[in-house]
Every structure is written in structure tokens, then in C-alpha cells.
Amino acid sequence: MAVPASQIEEVIAANQDSVVIVDEAYVDFGAESCVPLVDKYENLLVTQTFSKSRSLAGLRIGFAIGSQKLIGYLNDAKFSFNSYTMNAPTIAAGVASVQDEEYFQKTVARVVRTRENTKKELTRLGFTFPDSSTNFIFATHKDIPGEELFQALRSHNIYVRHWNKPRIQDSLRISIGTDEEMQALIAFLEDYLERRGN
């Protein structure tokens, strides 16, 4: 669930003596951006990545928006410590992704549509999950342990994330893929639940 910008603004306003960093990696999938607050708060730094909605995972490209003072501090750190400087092909890919607004809009719309369809199907199959404004769903089945589902899916080459941590051990992080990939996930889960008697 995305935190509303108004709630984030309360945190920023209450912590004027600290830098508040807002990570907007998933903002394009349905969240409200805090970028409009940058001019109002000198202590706010908003970061976004090109890895998610702009399909450039692995290139390690993104940006930060903040006051001139905060950006100056970032540049000082970058030039002193950052061994992950961007090369010319990465910069060219980033520029091209910003210029191709049509592709960006289609990609985001497809992910959101597929996510919403998948949520409906998972609900029908007995899963619950927090509301998602991302490109993944953090789903829990009401009767089946997460480890069991993880192993069953993996044995059929369907890969999701699972953590053996007490608070989340029964949940799976399901990334939104193509419509065909999500249909394969749902078809497998339907069959698995039927065979298991759920």
C-alpha cells in the first residue's frame, strides 16, 4: 500500500532538522509523488529509479530531486565514493526511455491492468494481500503455508519470492509478468488447490 503524500508531508514537516528521503521506485504504478513538495521543504530528497516502470533494470540508473544544497551533498559523495558511475550507453538508454513517453505509458498501463486482474484471481483462490501500488503482489493464502506454495510453484518453473521470517513466512512476493505468465501462475494455483482439496 502506498503511503499518501499528505502523511509523508507530516513526517517531513515534523523532522526539519533531518533529511527525509522518499524512495519512489514504484510511484508510476499508482502512488502519489512527493516531488511537488520539494520546493516547500529543504530537507526533502525524492529518489526514483528507471529499473521498474522504464524497464531498465540492471543499468543502475535513476535520479534524485531535492534542494540545491542536498543535491550538492549528493554530488560531493558521488564524486568521492561512488564507484558506480554511469557510462555513456546507460545515459543514452535513460534519455531514450524518458523521450519514449508512449512506450512508458503503455508499459505502466499493462502492468497495472495485469496486476489488477491477478489480484481478482488470487482473491477468488483464497489469497489475501495488502493493496499494491507496485509491480508485485505480496500474497498469503488462508490455508496453505508460504513455503509449501513456494516449493510447488518452483517445481513447475514458476518463480516467486519467499522469506523464512516469522512475520512473512506464509507470504509470497509475486512479481507481475506478462499476461501469459500470470495466467500460467493462476492456472497452476487452481490445479494445485483443487488437488489439495482447498
Task: Locate each region found by the language model.
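PLP-dependent aminotransferase class I/II
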Residues: 43-123, 127-130
